[in-house]
Amino acid sequence: MYYKFSGFTQKLAGAWASEAYSPQGLKPVVSTEAPPIIFATPTKLTSDSTVYDYAGKNKVPELQKFFQKADGVPVYLKRGLPDQMLYRTTMALTVGGTIYCLIALYMASQPKNK
């Protein structure tokens, strides 16, 4: 048996399954058909041409070989000096922010004496 909250009696009342699963005051949508799609610009199907839209070369296989090389260097430092600078800057800002937050929490926890 299914139950539904009655807004009139403010109690649970027996109900059919279709009534119990639909919210009060809302009816299920009758039309399940999707409206036609309208495009602002004409679309091109992917099967129309086999030419790539970009002029660049696919670098993914080369980068996969480069990053999967077993040379003992972490992936986030593989590209040399720029990665080292970015890593060190990120770590410095993280440590500095943590220290700043701890100092702010300490100062906020101390009562002010008048």
Swiss-Prot record:
Keywords: Acetylation, Membrane, Mitochondrion, Mitochondrion inner membrane, Transit peptide, Transmembrane, Transmembrane helix
Membrane topology value: Single-pass membrane protein
Coiled-coil residue spans: none
Annotated positions of the N6-acetyllysine modification: K69
Subcellular location(s) of the protein: Mitochondrion inner membrane
A GO term from the CC aspect: mitochondrion
GO biological process: mitochondrial electron transport, cytochrome c to oxygen; mitochondrial respirasome assembly
Induction: By estrogen. Expression is induced by ATF4 downstream of the EIF2AK3/PERK-mediated unfolded protein response, thereby increasing formation of respiratory chain supercomplexes.
CDD domains assigned to the protein according to its UniProt record, in alphabetical order: Cyt_c_Oxidase_VIIa
Superkingdom of source: Eukaryota
GO MF annotation: an example: protein-macromolecule adaptor activity
Presequence range in chain numbering: 1-55
SUPFAM superfamilies with a match to the protein in the record: Mitochondrial cytochrome c oxidase subunit VIIa
Stored InterPro entries: COX7a (IPR039297), Cyt_c_oxidase_su7a-rel_mt (IPR017267), Cyt_c_oxidase_su7a_sf (IPR036539), Cytc_oxidase_su7a_met (IPR003177)
Membrane-spanning ranges: 82-107
Primary localization class, coarse: mitochondrion
Family to which this protein belongs: Belongs to the cytochrome c oxidase VIIa family.
Cited function: Assembly factor that mediates the formation of some mitochondrial respiratory supercomplexes (respirasomes), thereby promoting oxidative phosphorylation and energy metabolism. Acts as a molecular adapter that associates with both mitochondrial respiratory complexes III (CIII) and IV (CIV), promoting their association. Mediates the formation of various mitochondrial respiratory supercomplexes, such as MCIII(2)IV(2), composed of two CIII and two CIV, and the CS-respirasome (MCI(1)III(2)IV(2)), composed of one CI, two CIII and two CIV.
Subunit and partners: Interacts with the mitochondrial respiratory complexes III (CIII) and IV (CIV), promoting their association.
Name of protein: Cytochrome c oxidase subunit 7A2-like, mitochondrial
Organism the protein comes from: Homo sapiens
Gene that produces this protein: COX7A2L
